[in-house]
Regions:
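Hydrophobic faces of well-ordered beta-strands that scaffold small-molecule active sites
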Residues: 34-40, 65-67, 92-95, 133-135, ...
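Aromatic-lined carbohydrate-recognition surfaces of secreted/lumenal glycan-active proteins
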Residues: 39-41, 93-100, 156-193, 238-249
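Short, acidic/polar
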Residues: 43-58, 108-124, 188-200, 263-276
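Substrate-binding cleft of extracellular glycoside hydrolase catalytic domains
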Residues: 45-46, 70-155, 262-266
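Aromatic- and acid-rich polysaccharide-binding/catalytic face
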Residues: 62, 67, 192-222
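Substrate-binding cleft of secreted/luminal carbohydrate-active enzymes
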Residues: 212-215, 236-298
């Protein structure tokens, strides 16, 4: 049975009433039950400034942190942080993964990660333990994706299926990042056939859709590009989280909220939640990533 460990907290979602002319004011139009998550990649910097990151996470009303594991840091550093975070209602997931995990050295890297987590969990008190595993593999960035797609997909599925077994042995939920376009990636192999996106949603306990667009509705907006994943999540009882980008991007002006600012991002997320309330609403919103989020203009 899948472990459903998504914590839903009351977060004020700002909608903005954009009037005409000068003097337009923003105001709260609605309150919705939704949790906020974020990725923390610069682990060493923040683990040496734990009071600062906890204060900022609370300011942003974050309830789930995906913390990349830096094994150069002592386990005691993580124990202290997680205990303080949990006391503030913040769950911490162990984050790792890389495109080369589907390559020849991937199995060894994955084993090393889970061995570290296993040893850590065994030594940590309940209030110091990770709340889940969060994988960000991005197999499409590995060199074999273009010249041997079928083999790459099969190796990726092995990574995810093994991670599911390893996570459940630790009694932890497995969360997986996938891009929104995985719904259109077909596969046919020993794992069956169908959409790769649907397969991941079936295998993982939680899935974050990297829906990197800076508008909620209209054509090619967040709501439209995540429609299939949200529907599959409802059918398969897998919580679907929607991820948005705050890093500057050279892939197009429609990708990131970096230039638009935090107020505009919250406005669009409010529109997304309003549109999705009737059917297949996301379980949570994830902001990528913590450092770039902090650097956004208001």
């Amino acid at each position: 049975m899948k472990s459903k460990c998504v914590l839903i907290f009351l977060v004020v979602v700002w909608l903005f009433n954009m009037g005409k002319g000068i003097g337009c004011e923003s105001k709260v139009n609605a309150e919705m039950n939704i949790s906020l998550s974020t990725w923390v990649w610069d682990t060493k910097k923040w683990m040496l400034n734990q009071e600062a990151i906890l204060e900022k996470l609370q300011e942003k009303k974050v309830t789930n942190v995906y913390l990349q594991i830096d094994t150069d840091l002592l386990p005691s550093v993580y124990r202290h942080f997680i205990q303080q975070a949990q006391a503030k209602g913040i769950s911490v997931y162990a984050l790792d993964g890389a495109p080369y995990w589907i390559g020849p050295s991937g199995i060894e890297e994955q084993e090393a990660f889970f061995n570290w987590i296993t040893a850590y969990q065994a030594e940590a008190d309940d209030q110091q333990q990770f709340s889940g595993i969060h994988l960000d593999v991005e197999p499409y960035l590995y060199k074999s994706w273009e010249n041997n797609r079928a083999k790459s997909i099969l190796h990726y599925q092995y990574v995810i299926s093994q991670a599911a077994v390893q996570s459940h042995e630790l009694h932890l939920p497995l969360a997986v990042d996938i891009p929104f376009w995985f719904d259109g990636v077909p596969f046919k192999n020993s794992n069956g056939s169908g959409s790769l996106g649907q397969w991941v949603i079936q295998y993982a306990d939680e899935v974050t859709i990297m829906a990197y667009r800076n508008h909620a509705d209209k054509e090619n907006g967040i709501a439209e590009i995540t429609e299939n994943e949200r529907r599959w999540g409802r059918v398969l009882s897998t919580p679907i989280e929607i991820g948005v980008e705050t890093m500057a991007s050279d892939e197009g002006e429609y990708i990131s909220f970096s230039a638009k600012g935090e107020e505009k991002m919250m406005q669009e997320l409010g529109m997304l939640l309003t549109e999705c309330q009737a059917e297949n609403s996301p379980s949570s919103i994830a902001v990528h990533h913590f450092d770039s989020w902090l650097q956004m203009k208001p």
